[in-house]
Amino acid sequence: MMMLSKSLLSAATAASALAAVLQPVPRASSFVTISGTQFNIDGKVGYFAGTNCYWCSFLTNHADVDSTFSHISSSGLKVVRVWGFNDVNTQPSPGQIWFQKLSATGSTINTGADGLQTLDYVVQSAEQHNLKLIIPFVNNWSDYGGINAYVNAFGGNATTWYTNTAAQTQYRKYVQAVVSRYANSTAIFAWELGNEPRCNGCSTDVIVQWATSVSQYVKSLDSNHLVTLGDEGLGLSTGDGAYPYTYGEGTDFAKNVQIKSLDFGTFHLYPDSWGTNYTWGNGWIQTHAAACLAAGKPCVFEEYGAQQNPCTNEAPWQTTSLTTRGMGGDMFWQWGDTFANGAQSNSDPYTVWYNSSNWQCLVKNHVDAINGGTTTPPPVSSTTTTSSRTSSTPPPPGGSCSPLYGQCGGSGYTGPTCCAQGTCIYSNYWYSQCLNT
């Protein structure tokens, strides 16, 4: 997800005796491999369903990790995406989790109890609960540090980060530290170069060259696991010309998925932030599946969410993904859970809470459909339901007006009711959005 509230999770209450006793029995596990445009997970080739749980990496109570993973696994989900980064520039207060402190005078990778040892337990628990993890190394956004923390330490900006020698040297040191800890763990589904990498206004060659070099480096460290980019799928010539299909954010999905040292493609979908309607997402899935099919690799629909009527609007995306050649799996944003002490996990408007009606629709029903069950997701509504921040139709290709709050791809746009071509007066940095002025 692009932007999350910044919060470092503090310690929770101790585990109950019952939770300590009820330990799952892990099945025989193996490294994930690829078979055509699908994945082989522990000897079974097919389509998988998964979720995102970025906050799982920062839980200090092991019982909370175990209960969350128990709920995810028992729901039939196979893969969980967790953050593998937590970058800071100054020493946090005691008890707060941080993985890396970045400084031009000497950076520190935290392997202590308030550092990578918390991620150690996440990997251990995933092994126990028969789950696989996708772990990104850096965030494009400033949540949990991200590229901005590197910029604070080594200078430059978010676009020069990809070619900044000092920043890239430290990034690779961190990659090596993380990969070396888990290179032999069958709980790792894939290493991810970053969460939603962008290079606004850059040639798409910048990210292609960076992704090629870094993915080759990761492969040199670990030949057991898959590697992927972690991009949103922005930049694709086969779409309708709406903002997400354009190349202003410096990414070219078709080029990226063709990189030999990347094993599969990823893409995300957020109509509420992109100025598109919900049904538009079905075509977005199909065009990316076609690009992956052309590359001979699987696509993973890695993040998606709808702020309004999630069951009605997201279930058709799941059906489209499941039934489209080239798709290997999907992972909704994001999992929500309640811990033994009654506290709830971090959440946002897209959260699907365990045991909720949306969980029944988007998790249990979807898993049943994958496993050949008879559960039928709700049909696409005959009338398009959109957020108040969403246009009823995608922005017209090459037009002079994009919907209010629709992303304008970094170009100069302004206007009281829509993004009209001109000079940008107020832009939302996080989502490249044209806002009301």
UniProtKB/Swiss-Prot annotation:
Domain of life: Eukaryota
The protein, known as: Mannan endo-1,4-beta-mannosidase A
pH-dependence annotation: Optimum pH is 5.0. Stable from pH 2.5 to 7.0.
UniProt keyword Manganese present: no
Keywords: Disulfide bond, Glycoprotein, Glycosidase, Hydrolase, Secreted, Signal
Domain notes: The enzyme consists of two functional domains, a catalytic core joined to a carbohydrate-binding domain (CBM) by a serine-, threonine-, and proline-rich, highly glycosylated linker sequence. The CBM binds to cellulose but not to mannan, and increases the mannan-hydrolysis of complex substrates.
Annotated compartments: Secreted
Record-annotated site: Important for transglycosylation activity: R198
Biased composition (Low complexity): 381-392
Gene that produces this protein: man1
PROSITE patterns, A to Z: CBM1_1, CBM1_2
EC number of the protein: 3.2.1.78
Membership in a protein family: Belongs to the glycosyl hydrolase 5 (cellulase A) family.
Outcome reported for the amino acid change (mutating R198K): Shows an altered product profile, producing mannotriose and mannose from mannotetraose, compared to predominantly mannobiose in the wild type
Organismal lineage: Eukaryota, Fungi, Dikarya, Ascomycota, Pezizomycotina
Maturation-removed propeptide residues: 20-27
Residues of the signal peptide: 1-19
Disulphide linkage map: C53-C56, C199-C202, C292-C299, C311-C361
The reaction(s) this protein catalyses: Random hydrolysis of (1->4)-beta-D-mannosidic linkages in mannans, galactomannans and glucomannans
Function as written in the Swiss-Prot or TrEMBL entry: Endo-1,4-mannanase that catalyzes the random hydrolysis of (1->4)-beta-D-mannosidic linkages in mannans and heteromannans. It is a crucial enzyme for depolymerization of seed galactomannans and wood galactoglucomannans. Active against locust bean gum and ivory nut mannan, releasing mainly tri- and disaccharides. Also has transglycosylation activity. Transglycosylation of two mannotrioses into a mannohexaose is the major transglycosylation route.
Region (Linker): 377-399
Chain spans, region Disordered: 372-399
Residue ranges of every copy of the CBM1 domain listed in the record: 400-435
PANTHER family reported in the protein's UniProt record: MANNAN ENDO-1,4-BETA-MANNOSIDASE 1 (PTHR31451:SF39), PTHR31451
GO cellular component: extracellular region
Oligomer status and interactors: Monomer.
SUPFAM superfamilies: (Trans)glycosidases, Cellulose-binding domain
Annotated region described as Catalytic, given as residue ranges: 28-376
